[in-house]
Amino acid sequence: MEARPSGVVAATGVRRAFGDAVVLGGVDLFVEPGEIVALLGASGSGKSTLLRVLAGLDEDAEGEVHTSGSKAVVFQEHRLLPWKRVVDNVALGVRGKDAKQRAATALEEVGLAERGKAWPSELSGGQSQRVAFARALVREPELLLLDEPFGALDALTRLKMQALFARLHEAHGFAALLVTHDVDEALLLADRLLVLDGGRIAEEIKVDLGHPRSVDMEGFAVLRRRLLGLLHVPTET
């Protein structure tokens, strides 16, 4: 597949090995502006490795990777600096005299307008992850790279964060690559699904379900069964 440079992400032949273990064996991946792409695969399939390559955090990978515009990364761990207040964590690295005001605006967007002066240790897990999203949003990224950002949250908080992500995407229109192991999450949020297997993209699925989505909407269960089959997860018949 030829890279299409008009995309937010155009990657071809991405290869990454750790010693004799080849984790990525020639991955081709493309993300359109404003598109949400979910990347799924078994544990150890190389999902997080691929995201790190696309984020520019792995200099030992081979292949061609092109990203256009600004990008931000949200990890499963919020990685907030405990010695800085919440608003200062969000403003960290942001240039300009209005950096703190922009950080405060981003916190308001994620529902934490009143927590700017709090310390990270005073936040719940869900609040900490909201701060991580605010820290990404304040940079006004064209591309958001997310490595299982809701994986450490309880079920209810996870649903709330998924809804927040959908609202933020609607408001800002950024492209996103979402690494997740949650099939329902992928189907609820993504425009397109990629299954990573054997070091390559083994399957691509277009999600034509419309918005807003729910697990009981028509067509959801069919796509869910198909995706679980591709991931080699047994399903009830």
Feature-to-residue mapping (PLM):
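A short, proline-enriched helix->beta-strand linker immediately N-terminal to the Walker B motif
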Residues: 138-142
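Conserved ABC ATPase signature
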Residues: 119-123, 127
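Helix-to-loop junction immediately C-terminal to a conserved catalytic motif
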Residues: 55
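The feature captures the beta-strand-to-loop junction immediately N-terminal to the Walker
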Residues: 40-42
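Hydrophobic anchor residue at the start of the ABC signature
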Residues: 133
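Short helical segment in ABC ATPase nucleotide-binding domains corresponding to the A-loop/adjacent helical element
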Residues: 87-95, 100, 206
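Conserved structural motif at the start of ABC-family nucleotide-binding domains
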Residues: 9-11, 24-26
